Amino acid sequence: MRLHYLLFVFLILFLVPAPGDTFIPKSLRRFFCRVRGGRCAILNCLGKEEQIGRCSNRGQKCCRKKK
């Protein structure tokens, strides 16, 4: 039974996005952006937003309102 918990932890660690990782598919990047309270901006974030990540390798940025 403890093995299941260990495997679950490794699965979560594998799916959590790390800065600069390119092996994460674009759909997962968009999902994690929305989970963190952000949105995918095509070019730049708006003036009242901050960049918290990337939605794609081609320039889409994950932005959310500044706190």
Curated annotation (Swiss-Prot):
Q: Which Pfam family is an annotated match for this chain, by its short name?
A: Defensin_beta
- Record keywords, A-Z: Antibiotic, Antimicrobial, Defensin, Disulfide bond, Secreted, Signal
GO BP of this protein: cell chemotaxis; defense response to bacterium; defense response to Gram-negative bacterium; defense response to Gram-positive bacterium; killing by host of symbiont cells
Which pairs are disulfide-linked?
33-62, 40-55, 45-63
List the GO cellular component terms: extracellular space
A GO molecular function annotation here is: CCR6 chemokine receptor binding
- Location(s), subcellular: Secreted
Q: Tell me where it mainly resides.
A: secreted
Q: Which residues form the signal peptide?
A: 1-22
Parts of the chain that traverse the membrane = none
Return the PANTHER family for the record.
BETA-DEFENSIN (PTHR20515), BETA-DEFENSIN 103 (PTHR20515:SF0)
Q: What does this protein do?
A: Has antibacterial activity.
Q: Which family does it belong to?
A: Belongs to the beta-defensin family.
Q: Identify this protein by name.
A: Beta-defensin 14
Species of origin: Rattus norvegicus
Lineage of producing organism: Eukaryota, Metazoa, Chordata, Craniata, Vertebrata
- Give the gene that encodes this protein: Defb14
